[in-house]
């Protein structure tokens, strides 16, 4: 029934964010026409939590958050402090358009 998922990042500077995803995070992409880049995402999982704020969140998962932060530092990109959460160790990257992107090393069981 469901064959995939399509996530959207809304940005004040979408062109800069697209280049960041492609060139800094090295996420493969295709040009679907007119310069509109669609990025390939790795296998994903979906959690549903209680709440009434109507917001959804997007996090990327990495194997080693310390190595991720070091790799971005080598590209002159600063990540937020690594914090412990019940479900993993998380950092945030501020995209060129100003949005924050969470990246975490999962400590929870994964499907």
Regions found by a protein language model. Give the residues of each.
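Short, charged/polar surface micro-motifs in flexible loops or helix N-caps
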Residues: 42-46, 53-54, 64-67
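Active-site beta-strand termini and strand-to-loop segments that position acidic
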Residues: 39-43, 50-51, 93-96, 106
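Short amphipathic alpha-helices within nucleic acid-binding modules
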Residues: 20, 66-71
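Core segments of cupin and vicinal oxygen chelate
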Residues: 8-46
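Helix N-cap motif at beta-to-alpha junctions
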Residues: 13-14, 63-65
């Amino acid at each position: 029934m469901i064959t995939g998922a399509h996530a959207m990042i809304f940005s004040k500077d979408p062109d800069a964010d697209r280049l960041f995803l492609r060139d800094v995070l090295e996420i493969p992409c295709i040009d679907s026409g007119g310069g509109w880049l669609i990025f390939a995402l790795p296998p994903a999982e979906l959690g549903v939590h209680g709440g009434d704020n109507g917001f959804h969140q997007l996090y990327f998962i990495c194997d080693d958050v310390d190595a991720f932060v070091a790799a971005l530092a080598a590209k002159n990109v600063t990540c937020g402090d690594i914090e412990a959460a019940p479900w993993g160790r998380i950092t945030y990257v501020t995209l060129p358009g100003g949005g924050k992107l969470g990246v975490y090393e999962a400590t929870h069981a994964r499907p």
